Amino acid sequence: MKMKIGINGFGRIGRLVARVALMSDDIELVAVNDPFITTEYMTYMFKYDSVHGQWKKDELKVKDSKTLLFGDKPLTVFGVRNPEEDPWGEAGAEYVVESTGVFTDKDKAAAHLKGGAKKVVISAPSGNAPMFVVGVNEKEYKKDIDIVSNASCTTNCLAPLAKVLNDKFGIVEGLMTTVHSITATRKTVDGPSMKDWRGGRAASFNIIPSSTGAAKAVGKVLPALNGKLTGMAFRVPTVDVSVVDLTARLEKAATYDEIKAAIKHESETSLKGILGYTEDDVVSTDFVGDSRSSIFDAKAGIALNGNFVKVVSWYDNEWGYSNRVIDLIRHMASVA
């Protein structure tokens, strides 16, 4: 039986989660809510994507103001501002992906339950909802948990890598830098940004230092690393694909070749499909459309000595993350 999902917020992640869902045999997308766009514009935004290309799987057309057709399959569209008013139950949506970026608080996301949803997956970090990273701690999920966070794209990249390093060699402490592509909140030209002055500068013309909670969040999904990692970001003028640089001090001395071998082994076994491994001379665009959370770049890393190492891992911060949202729903359904 297919898992029926709804999506609240049809932005970058909402639209890509929809693509993943529509490409999955075990998932049925039944409803989308976005109060700011019409069904006609929703169709256009879904069909054409500057990064991931044109949608060609099914013909997409508007049936009426509240229904889209993917081939002959109807999709119900709402235009509701308040989550508690979304009629998810009527549409048959059991799992709701909260991808507006607004309702990341557990209590605010809980409003979807009032509309008939059974479970809510927040596609962003949350201050108080339990966070799960597929491949790292999803087995901690219990069926009585109704609201979860899929953490951030960067945490999804860093956590599997940190898990392997910590399991095999032990991490004493580490600093992470993510070189991160442009996202929707960035400015096209210099503009007001009172909370983050640098973040208000033109994204296409600058390398912008920024804060990120991604490294600290690893401590939430891997308690053994709580307090051992922190990090920052450089926002750069690329539209998709980002890269994590983790510099760590190890408890157990290891050569860089031993570290590579450990990561390669896990990428082929317990973390297959989540953690990748490459020895090719790759650059960022080589990972557009890569569904894995984290692809370790064996040639990019370096060790100073047996206990001090820098490891580098790529991620499609849009497509990889959207695939994990669906994977998390699959896992939740298997537990329920």
UniProtKB/Swiss-Prot annotation:
Positions bound to NAD(+): R12, I13, D34, R81, N317
Residues where D-glyceraldehyde 3-phosphate binds: S152, C153, T154, T183, T212, G213, R235
Lineage of the organism: Eukaryota, Viridiplantae, Streptophyta, Embryophyta, Tracheophyta
Reactions that this protein is recorded to catalyse: D-glyceraldehyde 3-phosphate + phosphate + NAD(+) = (2R)-3-phospho-glyceroyl phosphate + NADH + H(+)
A GO CC term attached to the entry: cytosol
Gene: GAPC
Pathway this chain belongs to: Carbohydrate degradation; glycolysis; pyruvate from D-glyceraldehyde 3-phosphate: step 1/5
PROSITE patterns given in the database record: GAPDH
Protein name stated in the entry: Glyceraldehyde-3-phosphate dehydrogenase, cytosolic
Active site per UniProt: C153
Cell compartments where the protein resides: Cytoplasm
UniProt function note: Key enzyme in glycolysis that catalyzes the first step of the pathway by converting D-glyceraldehyde 3-phosphate (G3P) into 3-phospho-D-glyceroyl phosphate. Essential for the maintenance of cellular ATP levels and carbohydrate metabolism.
Something else known: Plants contain two types of GAPDH: cytosolic forms which participate in glycolysis and chloroplast forms which participate in photosynthesis. All the forms are encoded by distinct genes.
Subunit structure of this chain's protein: Homotetramer.
Gene3D superfamilies, sorted: Dihydrodipicolinate Reductase, domain 2, NAD(P)-binding Rossmann-like Domain
Entry keyword set: Cytoplasm, Glycolysis, NAD, Oxidoreductase
Annotated site, Activates thiol group during catalysis, chain positions: H180
UniProt-recorded Gene Ontology molecular function terms: glyceraldehyde-3-phosphate dehydrogenase (NAD+) (phosphorylating) activity; NAD binding; NADP binding
